[in-house]
């Protein structure tokens, strides 16, 4: 349990922004359901440090199984997707920020696109497969592309100008990402575990195995 927005703001200010070179695009992933923060002030703090883009994946209630008891408890306590939509609208309409919306279900995806009108929308097809800690019982890459394309079609109906990107499920490798580009009508992809977890696991495991295989000369 931690203050995710404070952690995001502090890390961005102290570690990311000082290390930036050139014209990198920095997006702050914020928790719009933070009961201890005025989101207008959080957004202003982002702008003040030079961050001009925000997303609602920090974390999102959309990720929680909507049929679960915990989802019902959270929403009844005021932790809602509507708060995330309101944050994205505030960032775009009143603060002039680039917004990246995200949804884990078709219903939530349509709601975010219709109400928040984000500049970019990322359809999250599910937890990324692969690696040491990946979830390996999810969709195939073909199913991931099919499900993602269906979400794209529905999102365009309510927000025709949105830029659409894919994420998650079976999109584990660059080859998988190429499959998504070739078999969906989106504009790109958003990586996570496929760039910052799985390749590192492989590299560290390979290096450790090589060291472990060393022997003293006779």
Question: What does each model-identified segment do?
Answer:
Residues 36-45, 106-116, 169-186:
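Catalytic cores of alpha/beta
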Residues 49-64, 118-135, 183-207:
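Glycine-rich phosphate-binding active-site loops on the catalytic face of alpha/beta enzymes
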Residues 59-86, 107-138:
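Histidine/lysine/aspartate-rich catalytic loop segments that bind and position anionic ligands
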């Amino acid at each position: 349990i931690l203050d995710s927005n404070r952690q995001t703001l502090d890390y961005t200010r102290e570690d990311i922004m000082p290390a930036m070179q050139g014209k990198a695009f920095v997006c702050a992933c914020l928790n719009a359901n933070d009961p201890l923060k005025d989101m207008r002030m959080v957004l202003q703090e982002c702008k003040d440090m030079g961050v001009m883009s925000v997303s609602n994946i920090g974390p999102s209630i959309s990720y929680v199984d909507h049929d679960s008891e915990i989802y019902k408890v959270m929403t009844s306590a005021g932790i809602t997707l509507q708060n995330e939509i309101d944050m994205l609208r505030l960032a775009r309409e009143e603060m002039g920020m680039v917004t990246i919306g995200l949804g884990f279900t078709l219903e939530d995806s349509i709601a975010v696109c219709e109400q928040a009108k984000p500049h970019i929308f990322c359809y999250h097809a599910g937890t990324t497969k692969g690696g040491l800690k990946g979830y390996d019982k999810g969709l195939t890459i073909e199913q991931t592309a099919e499900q993602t394309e269906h979400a794209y079609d529905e999102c365009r109906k309510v927000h025709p100008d949105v830029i659409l990107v894919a994420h998650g499920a079976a999109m584990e490798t660059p080859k998988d990402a190429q499959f998504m580009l070739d078999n969906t009508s989106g504009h790109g992809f958003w990586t996570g575990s496929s760039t910052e977890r799985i390749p590192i696991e492989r590299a560290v495991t390979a290096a450790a195995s090589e060291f472990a295989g060393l022997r003293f000369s006779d």
